[in-house]
């Protein structure tokens, strides 16, 4: 019975990943941004900054939609189709989702307290990857030495640019909770 009480009633409440690319939000390039919508059509859906940039750059895929996006500077929500105006500063000026942002800050703070050296790549929020496989292998190994931690930080710095380069989103991105569950189970990125 306790297990049932821990599970949120809505799956969206416990999610810390983008519903477009299925990658986890972070404090850097994948910060959670909440689409405001317009006075007529309120939106409120949350996307990561990278997906929002991609949507702003390509529009809906049709030439007329791309032209309208350039003229009016608006992004159409992929879930509810509500238009959201882009501020003059671009995608990074859209307000952050305060609930998700605070949860990400708490998560980062907990990770920093767990690692006394404070890994710079993790603190900057640039590394949005899951290192579950590495974490599982390190759990039984005991605390890593300072030399291994320094080597890990150097590797994170060297590999950070390559991790940021990702394939672009396909033009026909569909949202389906079942597809998302399958993606999480197979640990693949759609």
UniProtKB/Swiss-Prot annotation:
Residues 126-135 have a biased composition (Acidic residues). Coiled coil: none annotated. InterPro entries: DUF4632, RING_finger_E3_ubiq-ligases, Znf_RING, Znf_RING/FYVE/PHD, Znf_RING_CS. Pfam families: DUF4632 (PF15451), zf-RING_5 (PF14634). Signal peptide: none annotated. It comes from the Eukaryota. The keyword Cell wall biogenesis/degradation does not apply. Residues 108-147 are annotated as: Disordered. Keywords: Metal-binding, Zinc, Zinc-finger. This is RING finger protein 227. The gene is Rnf227.
